[in-house]
Amino acid sequence: KRPLFQLGQILSTPGVLEHLDHHGVNAQPFLERHITGDFGDVCADDAKENLFAIEQGFRVLSAYTIAERKVWCITEADRSCTTLLFPEEY
């Protein structure tokens, strides 16, 4: 699958970084899913909103369960950066 948008700079909160490191998980496959339209654990309406956001240049949010924790992947509207964070860190 081809990328649907640019990630920009890839950032992570310290909590997610520690979680990924502790469980030996590479974030790359999740980032690839995010930019190719596999938005993970979001409802159908949110997935449709993401496709609209990609077309119109709005924020894109995916949600993945990584080592039993929900992790959000958010790309800003201006595509300057994509951040991995826990929902409670938003």
Report each predicted region and the residues it spans.
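Short, compact, well-ordered microdomains
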Residues: 55-90
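Compact soluble domain cores
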Residues: 1-60
